[in-house]
Structure formats: C-alpha cells, structure tokens
Design a protein with these regions (language model features):
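Pyridoxal 5′-phosphate
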Residues: 1-326
C-alpha cells in the first residue's frame, strides 16, 4: 500500500486501459524503483518504455521529452521531485506538453506532496501519487489522485469498495490518519518550508566551505526544502554512515528504500557521477523540528569523519602524493 501501490496502479491500470491506443510510455532514468520496476514489468508484456536522460542537476530536457512523444504514446510519468537529490522537475511545463499532445501525465509526488505547492489543474496533472509516511502520517497508506474522465482499470478485483476500483475492506484508521496528517502538513507547509530552506542552505554552505573535494548533488535552488545530498571524494559513504550513526546522526547514502543494497545509486549514476563518486554520497533530510544547533553539530561531525576516513584511504594518499609531484 502507499506510494508504491499508487505508482503501480497508475502505470499498470493505465497501460491496460489505453493499450488499444498505443503501448509507448515515457519516464525518466531517475525515477523511484516503484516506477522503474513497474516499467520493466510492462516491457516484458509488450510495452515500449522511453527513459529520458537528466542533466548534472537531475533535470530532464523538455526538448528531449517533446522528441520522445509518438502517436502511440499513452502516458508520461515523471516524478515531481527526486527522493535522493531533491531536484524538482518542471512539472507544469511537462503537463502542458502532455496536454498539447493528448497524452496522460502521471507524477510520483511522494517526496514533494505537502513540501511544495502542487496545483493539479494548473499543472495539467492527470494522476498523482502520494504517501502518508512522508507527512508524519501512518505507514502503509497513500493515495492516487485520478482526474475525472481518465480511464483506469481496477487494480484489485473483488468488492465494490473505492468506486469499484480497489476491492478490499478499507483501512479506516490509516485513511483517517492520512487525512489528519495531510490537513496538518498543509497548514504548516509555508512556515515549515521557510525554516527548512534556511537551515538547508546554512548546512550546505558550511559543508561546501569547510570540506575540500566535495560537492552538492541536485539543483541548488530547484530542490526540496528538506533535502541535502553531497558527494565526498576518497571515502566510502557506508563507512561515513556507520560513524555518523555512532554519533546519533541519522543519514543515508542513497534512497532509504535501497538501504540494503551495495550498488551505487542509479540516480547519482544518471546525473553523471562515476561509481566511486556515487559511493561517497551522503543524504541528509531535515524536518520541522530541525534546529541551527543541530546543523552545526552535523557539520562538525561530518568534517571530522570525512577527514578521519581520508586519513585511512589509500586513494587519498595517492592523491596527496600526486599533488606534491605537481
């Protein structure tokens, strides 16, 4: 349930409903695995998927999108904001292009919903996925917004619940909890966003200015208010996570949904990072409860840990030797 089911439903049920019109779907290389794996599933069943490239900031090219649309294109699915690097895509422009070509537009807004303003009519969004756990709501509950008039097949067959589109007894506690979480998130969004942007930019500035051989991943301004993603050369991100955890700091080296994987992030590879650069990444997520004091603590600990790991790194030692020789 939640965001993954919503993404699956949007793609699979739309593909089935519009298969007579065409079997071509457009998405991006940096989508959540709930989209990418669903696309792989559809490819095995005769659908053709075009995966759009992104630039170094994680943004798609609108010209590439326009060029990818064909007479048999039935759906464009582009995430609103990336869960790893925080980049916010040009959703309104994508929606306008989709509308002009008579193609349905779905956006995975799990990471962006209640973080940034979303207007489904102005942005020409036909379907939108969201999840409660990103709003401090219950886990395992989410929703799929479907514009009136969009044909979509039932995802779970059985009873007539949810307008006969998703059978099964409704999770009433989850639904009520999600509703309460959305109401609260919308109420505090403006003040929360202002606070998070201020703290985010403060911490980004400290890390950039005080740690050499590192950089920010994702767009500097077109990004989620609460997202920070850095790459640090000459270290392994997993080692940094362990040492941060010992200091009581929660972080990740990629998507929380792939925390058990040793493979480099597909998102970081898609924006052009080398494998070793992607392995040295750190993702930090802020909240409404974050403070400037905590940002200072994180900055100081990251500085110490990066230096400690580099002191043990043969790659860093080789780099220093090469600098001396030059």
């Amino acid at each position: 349930a939640g965001g993954s089911e919503s993404d699956n439903w949007a793609l699979k049920a739309t593909a089935e409903a519009y298969a007579s019109k065409g079997k071509h779907i457009i998405t991006t290389k940096i989508e959540h695995h709930a989209i990418l794996h669903t696309c792989e599933y559809l490819e095995k069943r005769g659908f053709e998927i075009t995966y759009l490239n992104v630039d170094r900031d994680g943004l798609i090219s609108l010209d590439e999108l326009k060029a990818a649309i064909r007479p048999d294109t039935i759906l464009i699915s582009v995430m609103f904001a990336n869960n790893e690097i925080g980049t916010i895509e040009p959703i309104a422009e994508i929606g306008e292009i989709a509308k002009e070509h008579g193609v349905l537009f779905h956006t995975d807004a799990v990471q962006a919903y209640a973080q940034v303003p979303i207007h489904v009519d102005e942005m020409h969004i036909d379907m939108l996925s969201a999840s409660g756990h990103k709003l401090n709501g219950p886990k395992g509950i989410g929703f799929l917004y479907i514009r009136k008039g969009v044909k979509i097949r039932s995802f779970v067959h059985g009873g007539a619940q949810e307008r006969s589109r998703r059978a099964g007894t409704e999770n009433i506690p989850g639904i009520v909890g999600l509703g309460a979480a959305v109401e609260r998130a919308m109420r505090i969004m403006d003040s929360k966003t202002r606070k998070e942007i201020e703290l985010r930019d403060y911490l980004i500035g400290r890390l950039e200015n005080e740690i050499p051989h590192c950089w920010l991943n994702g767009h500097r301004t077109k990004r989620l208010p609460n997202n920070i993603n850095f790459s640090f050369l000459f270290i392994e991100g997993e080692s940094m996570l362990i040492m941060l955890d010992m200091k009581g700091i929660c972080a990740s080296s990629g998507s929380a949904c792939t925390s058990g994987s040793l493979d480099p992030s597909h998102v970081l590879l898609a924006i052009g990072l080398k494998h070793e650069e992607a392995h040295g990444s750190l993702r930090l997520t802020l909240s409404e409860d974050s403070t400037k004091e905590e940002m200072d603590i994180v900055a100081e600990e990251v500085k110490k840990i990066v230096q400690r790991l580099r002191d043990m790194s043969p790659l860093y030692e080789d780099f220093l030797k090469s600098q001396k020789n030059n």
